[in-house]
Amino acid sequence: MHIPSCETAELELIRFAPALEEANRPSPDYDTERWLYVPNVYSEYRYILGTRGKHPLICIGINPSTAAPDHLDNTLKSVERIALYNGFDSFLMFNVYAQRATNPDDMELTYNAQLHQENLQAFDYILSLDQNSAPAIWAAWGTIIEKRPYLPPCVQDLIQLGKARHAVWYSAGKRSKKGHPHHPLYLRKDSVLEPFDASSYIAQLIQK
């Protein structure tokens, strides 16, 4: 379980670009040819965790917990199973907000603009990785998006980046009454990805 030790504004953030350089170098802790883990050390935030491939499924949750290479939590195990079932050769777990907190109630109340900007750079990078087609994005944040008022605008920024890369959005499982995409944890391993109109969804959410 991860409980934030401080506000992320109190940290000296590792910027995405140098963190990616480190993540692409050999590590004694895990196989860097299999895993993409940015930053490549456990910290109070995480930009990316996933497997390397030519046709990845990008899954977007709200915020990271404790998972690391070779130590996936149940949510990421589900993400990997569903990605493979739907014909992808790899998965990349990304989050609306990069702060680690196992309990979303522990997420910071004050949005850190610098952390978000670094996270956007990470997102644009993973959007560029699909070698076969337009990037595929699985919206999977569940109702947790209601936990903090800064989260929907963060999603809106991700949608804009996705448009520039001609990304295709999906969800899996039944959506909530308010239209939130289902969280991966309790989905069947044979869950099929369905088209998701992310732009209409976020426009309605921000209007409320």
Question: Predicted segments — roles?
Answer:
Residues 56, 89-90, 136, 168:
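Residues at the starts of beta-strands that form the adenosine-phosphate
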Residues 1-73:
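Active-site and ligand/interface coordination hotspots across diverse enzymes
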Residues 66, 100, 145:
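Feature marks short, surface-exposed loop/turn motifs that line or immediately flank catalytic pockets
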Residues 89-107:
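Short connector loops at secondary-structure junctions
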Residues 65-87:
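A short mixed-secondary-structure module that forms the rim of ligand-binding clefts
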Residues 2-3, 107-208:
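Glycine/proline-rich loop-helix segments at beta-alpha junctions forming the active-site rim
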Residues 43, 72-80, 113-122:
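Short acidic (Asp/Glu) patches
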